[in-house]
UniProtKB/Swiss-Prot annotation:
Residues 253-264 have a biased composition (Basic and acidic residues). It comes from Streptomyces avermitilis (strain ATCC 31267 / DSM 46492 / JCM 5070 / NBRC 14893 / NCIMB 12804 / NRRL 8165 / MA-4680). GO terms for biological process: thiamine diphosphate biosynthetic process. This is Thiazole synthase. Its main location: cytoplasm.
Amino acid sequence: MADDPFVLGDTPFSSRLIMGTGGAPSLDILERALVASGTELTTVAMRRVDAGVHGSVLSVLDRLGIRVLPNTAGCFTAGEAVLTARLAREALGTDLIKLEVIADERTLLPDPIELLDAAETLVDDGFTVLPYTNDDPVLARKLEDVGCAAVMPLGSPIGSGLGIRNPHNFQLIVEHARVPVILDAGAGTASDVALAMELGCAGVMLASAVTRAQEPVLMAEGMRHAVDAGRLAYRAGRIPRRHFAEASSPPEGRAHLDPERPAF
């Protein structure tokens, strides 16, 4: 929407849905899901990129006019992530990087110390850094302070489909952030995405929720509408939660029976 821009770095986007490509049953289904989602930005793991192969994910994105967001998936140290980001910039000609530095293979949770180190180095190197982080308001603020263009807290572990387990932390991150906050990881269905947007997230990044759905193309379309609906609800402002009922109609004009006289 023209009156509600979504900007990452210096780049404006119409869609607030960032798609991933991992886990798709086929390139054909991935392509149709990307179209249905309306995404303009799609992340690709650099370790899976082969720019010279016809019929690759990159060729699909190029044909659809979707901007590539390389990521550093699979990196365990700041050094590995920085090297991967620099290779991505050389290969793809973009300063955008989705920064991932994970602590272990079992949880795939971010390593906050290595992440912050890598983020600071890449910002100094001229990258537009979008870090995958824990739902920690303090770490989110530190990532913003070193110059990250957004913060991307997880709702729950990657691929878990558990949704946002700590909405309160998301609200704290959103309230104090001066950069876009993007849900990254954990969404399982459209209601998770709508909730993220209602909490004030500027966008949503997802992959498994679509690529592993029974009908990926339908789910992609559902996610597209969920992002829009959640954003509109956030901008509109929900009514306060109450412990008791509050009638929507005024009391004026109600029928009153005389207690001294029977109704019939």
